[in-house]
């Protein structure tokens, strides 16, 4: 009892007409509301159990084969696919039977002996429901799912047991307005629309958003008839909580309205972290891997700091090895004479370049202006002699080309 008293308390929302002396105003928060939220388990279990409501379907065994088609064989310059016999119609001569043919059967026709149902471990299903129940107590997850809970006084929302005595839908609407949950029911009502696609022809014409889920604790309660005609509002007995209702589509955070009797039964149905469940044999609530989310506080605690090794301030790091053939400073550390050797090689190279230039300059003689004019005159006289001695002067076509006319 001491551990239970230390747990948070949830306020019970009273309704009009309730006697203040009839019931206590608070109830202890059950451990199932603080269980770890596991969306991975919820998504997997929801995907598996949602398959169990499927109806087997298959195409007809005769589909695509209701004709006496035969292949024409080879020699007609057409494919060997079976062809419809006869004449006088477009159908005659058309290919049949194959999955590539118009009017043919499908590839691998579906059979009704497919494995439609999926088996899920009992403990995994229980963990999924516990996670979904815990998510209903987190306002952020409920709002992220799209529920209108701005006017709701507290999460989880618990109402008095007088709500289970409500018989009329008008009284049920009044109850929802008192606890601030009518906005969500109104949202579900206004979201009714026609389904896109062919589902509208197959008894699935309308779709709508999900409203609040009312969980009651008394078997045969009148609350079922009062709330069942409200669009989007669903009801469920606390002992028959279903993941398809607690997390529709595999998405956590359904807006749940609990009655007091249903909320008090959660402890006995799902147990606690120390005590197993009374209704589910051997089931104990899963514990969170990390109870305290403040990681800095955990690391800096005396218990952990007392066994943690001190910081190594003189850590020896790997030395970066540099290539001495490319890095001069590293080469000088290895061979101090390398600097002198490099300088001597540079000076020797400069000396070789200088000697080469001097040698070339010495070979090149400087010509005076008079010598240049004499060389030019000698060239002209040689050219005239060459023209006069040429046989081409006898032809008129070449005289101008040889310059003889000049």
Swiss-Prot record:
The UniProt keywords, alphabetically, are: Ribonucleoprotein, Ribosomal protein
Asked if the record carries the keyword Ribonucleoprotein, the reply is yes
Q: Does the keyword Ribosomal protein apply?
A: yes
Q: Name one GO molecular function term.
A: mRNA binding
> Which GO cellular component terms, listed alphabetically, does the Swiss-Prot or TrEMBL entry include?
cytosol; cytosolic large ribosomal subunit; cytosolic ribosome; nucleolus; plant-type cell wall; plasmodesma; vacuole
Where are the stretches annotated Disordered? 56-95
Q: Which GO terms describe its biological process?
A: translation
InterPro entries reported for this sequence: Ribos_uL4_C_dom, Ribosomal_uL4, Ribosomal_uL4_dom_sf, Ribosomal_uL4_euk/arc_CS, Ribosomal_uL4_euk/arch
Please state which protein family the record places this protein in. Answer: Belongs to the universal ribosomal protein uL4 family.
**Protein name from the UniProt record:** Large ribosomal subunit protein uL4z
Q: Which organism is it from?
A: Arabidopsis thaliana
């Amino acid at each position: 009892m001491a551990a239970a008293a230390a747990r948070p308390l949830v306020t019970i929302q009273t309704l009009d007409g309730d006697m203040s002396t009839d019931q206590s105003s608070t109830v202890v928060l059950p451990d199932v509301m603080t269980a770890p939220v596991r969306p991975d388990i919820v998504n997997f279990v929801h995907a598996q159990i949602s398959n169990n409501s499927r109806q087997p379907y298959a195409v007809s065994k005769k589909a695509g084969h209701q004709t006496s088609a035969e292949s024409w064989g080879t020699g007609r310059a057409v494919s060997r696919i079976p062809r419809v016999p006869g004449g006088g119609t477009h159908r005659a001569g058309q290919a049949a039977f194959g999955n590539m043919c118009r009017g043919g059967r499908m590839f691998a026709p579906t059979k009704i002996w497919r494995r439609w149902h999926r088996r899920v471990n009992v403990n995994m299903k229980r963990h999924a429901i516990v996670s979904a129940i815990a998510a209903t107590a987190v306002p952020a997850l409920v709002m992220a799912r799209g529920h209108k809970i701005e006017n709701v006084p507290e999460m989880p929302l618990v109402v008095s047991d007088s709500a289970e005595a409500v018989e009329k839908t008008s009284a049920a609407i009044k109850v929802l307005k008192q606890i601030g949950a009518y906005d969500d029911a109104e949202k579900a009502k206004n979201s009714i629309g026609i389904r896109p696609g062919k589902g509208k022809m197959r008894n699935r014409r309308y779709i709508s958003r999900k409203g609040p889920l009312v969980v009651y604790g008394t078997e045969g309660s009148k609350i079922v008839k009062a709330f069942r005609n409200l669009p989007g509002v669903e009801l469920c007995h606390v002992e028959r909580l279903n993941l398809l209702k607690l997390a529709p589509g595999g998405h956590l955070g359904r807006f749940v309205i609990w009655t007091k009797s249903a909320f008090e039964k959660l402890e006995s149905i799902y147990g606690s972290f120390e005590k197993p469940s009374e209704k589910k044999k051997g089931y104990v609530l899963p514990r969170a891997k990390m109870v305290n989310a403040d990681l800095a506080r955990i690391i800096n605690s005396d218990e952990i700091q007392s066994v943690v090794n001190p910081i190594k301030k003189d850590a020896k790091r790997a030395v970066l090895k540099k290539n001495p053939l490319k890095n001069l400073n590293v080469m000088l550390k290895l061979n101090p004479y390398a600097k002198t050797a490099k300088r001597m090689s540079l000076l020797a190279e400069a000396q070789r370049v200088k000697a080469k230039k001097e040698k070339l300059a010495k070979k090149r003689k400087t010509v005076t202006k008079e010598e240049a004019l004499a060389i030019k005159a000698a060239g002209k006289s040689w050219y005239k002699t060459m023209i006069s001695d040429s046989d081409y002067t006898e032809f008129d076509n070449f005289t101008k080309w040889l310059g003889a006319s000049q």
